[in-house]
């Protein structure tokens, strides 16, 4: 991971650990609210930033959960390598965000390597008023909810072409 003084202003803003952590937290919250088969798998956190921070992936996400992941992947086969590549290239930023949010107890991880909301509740004064940040947070919730219906982590990674 690059030291902060070696990051460009754009890189520091876009991959700010607090911002990335907030995106992951919103996905975790929605996943856990909608899942019938357990909490948010830790390994799934590596897909959140690629879907939300890559313009091509972000803009191709379905509007509703009625489009299942497997159907979306079939219709967007050309994007499958992008997802795997972005997951790999954004791994360090995901790690940095998770480390921050776990250390602040905004997220917690259990013995099954599942993520849940932590014991600390941060007062969030989002006053974005339809800004891109607010839209990203809503799409993070959509993504968490959508992935909660996509099957287990092995199935999801296999569909995307990521090997564990």
What residue spans do the PLM features occupy?
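Generic structural signal for hydrophobic core residues of well-folded globular domains
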Residues: 27-32, 51-55, 101, 147-150, ...
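Glycine-rich, aromatic-bearing surface loops/beta-hairpins
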Residues: 125-164
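A glycine-rich, hydrophobic loop/mini-helix early in the fold
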Residues: 40-74
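Long, hydrophobic N-terminal alpha-helical segment
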Residues: 3-52
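Minor-groove-contacting beta-hairpin "wing" of winged helix-turn-helix DNA-binding domains
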Residues: 113-119
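Basic amphipathic alpha-helical segments that dock to polyanions
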Residues: 96-108
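Short, extreme N-terminal leader segments that mark the start of a protein/domain
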Residues: 1-19, 149-164
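Helix-adjacent hinge/juxtasegments
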Residues: 70-93
């Amino acid at each position: 991971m690059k030291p902060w003084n070696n990051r460009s202003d754009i890189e520091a803003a876009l991959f700010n650990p607090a911002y990335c952590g907030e995106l992951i937290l919103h996905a975790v919250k929605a996943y856990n609210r909608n899942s019938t088969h357990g909490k948010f798998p830790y390994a799934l956190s590596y897909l959140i930033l690629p879907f939300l921070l890559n313009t091509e992936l972000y803009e191709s996400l379905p509007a509703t959960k009625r489009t299942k992941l497997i159907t979306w992947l079939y219709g967007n086969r050309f994007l499958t390598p992008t997802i795997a590549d972005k997951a790999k290239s954004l791994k360090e930023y995901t790690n940095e965000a998770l480390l921050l949010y776990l250390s602040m107890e905004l997220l917690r991880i259990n013995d099954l390597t599942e993520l849940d909301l932590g014991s600390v509740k941060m007062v969030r004064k989002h006053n974005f008023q339809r800004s891109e940040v607010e839209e990203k947070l809503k799409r993070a919730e959509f993504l968490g909810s959508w992935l909660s219906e996509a099957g287990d982590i092995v199935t999801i990674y296999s569909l995307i072409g990521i090997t564990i």
